């Protein structure tokens, strides 16, 4: 829970980065597009799923549902920032500089969020199945920041039991 609360604070900072980027690019960050409404709906649905799980009275199950919801959100968030990074690689001039600055400000946090959250979710699911889990997960212990690092950490989990 503490891990995800920290991610929330960083995500709010990332939101500020996007709003600033919109301002720099002359875009209204408050414009409601059809796709933005869908994203909002998905986010609200994930929150509702967590609330429903919490009401079920099983704290371990609620924690696992919350973890799965966070993985869904972080996976999409990571993909969006990765896409912004791809555009930043080819953009030039003021646009390129603005995109690169925004991406560089957020990329490391997004990598951390995704790989660590996936590790927590995997280990909590393993624990829920009654199997030995590595808690905190290897990704956390080894403080991985890349996909390769996350893969290596996961491969080492058996030795950490």
Q: Which sequence ranges carry the predicted segments?
A:
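Amphipathic alpha-helical hairpins
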Residues: 1-161
């Amino acid at each position: 829970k503490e891990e995800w609360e920290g991610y929330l604070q960083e995500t709010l900072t990332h939101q500020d980065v996007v709003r600033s980027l919109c301002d720099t690019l002359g875009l209204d960050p408050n414009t409601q597009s059809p796709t933005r409404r869908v994203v909002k709906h998905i986010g609200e649905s994930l929150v509702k799923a967590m609330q429903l799980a919490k009401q079920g009275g099983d704290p371990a199950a609620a924690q696992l549902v919350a973890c799965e919801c966070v993985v869904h959100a972080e996976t999409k968030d990571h993909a969006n920032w990765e896409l912004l990074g791809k555009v930043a690689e080819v953009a030039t001039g003021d646009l390129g500089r603005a995109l690169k600055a925004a991406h560089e400000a957020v990329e490391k946090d997004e990598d951390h969020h995704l790989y660590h959250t996936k590790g927590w979710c995997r280990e909590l699911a393993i624990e829920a199945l009654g199997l030995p889990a590595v808690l905190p997960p290897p990704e956390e212990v080894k403080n991985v920041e890349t996909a390769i690092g996350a893969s290596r950490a996961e491969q080492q989990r058996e030795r950490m039991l």
